[in-house]
Amino acid sequence: MSAYCGKYKDELIKNAAYIGTPGKGILAADESTGTIGKRFASINVENVEENRRSLRELLFTTPGALQHLSGVILFEETLYQKTKDGKPFVDVLKEGGVLPGIKVDKGTVEVAGTNKETTTQGHDDLGKRCAKYYEAGARFAKWRAVLKIGPNEPSQLSIDLNAQGLARYAIICQENGLVPIVEPEILVDGSHDIERCAYVTEKVLAACYKALNEHHVLLEGSLLKPNMVTPGSESKKVSPQLIAEYTVRALQRTVPAAVPAIVFLSGGQSEEEATVNLNAMNKLSTKKPWALSFSFGRALQQSTLKAWGGKTENVVKAQKAFITRCKANSEATLGTYQGDAVLGEGASESLHVKDYKY
């Protein structure tokens, strides 16, 4: 049997290509209730549904922001929320030319017999949930697998389990009309150098595409959300140019040209760092058969959160910070970012959280 060729085939290909439109990218606004609670705690805002809804309304209704986005990943709660005027968020996004997406994994669990390595859960009722989310207006999905670099990590067992898990998720999504974003995140935690990260990234991506192929996933109707290839968090920083070279080379060696776009996660980099590194990749004159774009959460929201602080009177100021980051990242997808964005408070601070849970 070849790749998926069911009733959603053409729609999947069209939507995946649209998400990869040059000049656009993805806002990851799918933080779980627990994760957004930690963000709110940093700005002294109570973690209740109305505050979560208010933040997301602030983001989705920022004048001019949606033109820089092709997709927004939502948490299940947000998929069904509305603006204070009663308009469903899904409609706000669609009218702004943005595809709604949905986080479908149910978090990680430790793999017995390993050194605290994890696999991702959520397959059991996935088909049913995907059908329900499609009905509610979602057109793509996200599933995060987490791997770590250590003296003996990632183990082959962890690589295989996570690659198989991502592939199973991807084909179930496609059978239900959702473009799967395949996210094998290799955490930045550790003191490893950039060469070690490149080696592990290539190994993990090769395993993922082997598994995707074995599960008959339609690559043209899928997207990849990888980490950038960088030194570990306890290692000396390197230039954006070096990060760009190592990252693009790892992708050239492992990601088939059939994949329409690669949307990077920010992995705890500061807002500005993530943008500058993406820009450096798009400036490289080498073979890049896929669009290179962004799927940023923290790196699109940090200065916005700081400016907002949970106060209605700060909404306009916060939206200004948000549009600044959207525009900067839009330019980075074209390799035209000049590093001239007005940096809001928090734009330069590292957003790294050890052993990050989403």
UniProtKB/Swiss-Prot annotation:
Top-tier EC class: lyase
Coiled-coil ranges per UniProt: none
EC number(s) reported in the record: 4.1.2.13
Pfam families per record: Glycolytic
Subcellular location: Cytoplasm, Cytosol
InterPro entries recorded: Aldolase_I_AS, Aldolase_TIM, FBA_I
SUPFAM superfamilies: Aldolase (SSF51569)
Gene Ontology cellular-component annotations: cytosol
Keyword Lyase found: yes
Site (Necessary for preference for fructose 1,6-bisphosphate over fructose 1-phosphate): Y358
The protein's annotated pathway: Carbohydrate degradation; glycolysis; D-glyceraldehyde 3-phosphate and glycerone phosphate from D-glucose: step 4/4
Residues at which substrate binds: R39, S266, G267, G268, R298
Described function: Fructose-bisphosphate aldolase that plays a key role in glycolysis and gluconeogenesis.
Record-stated family: Belongs to the class I fructose-bisphosphate aldolase family.
Entry protein name: Fructose-bisphosphate aldolase 3, cytoplasmic
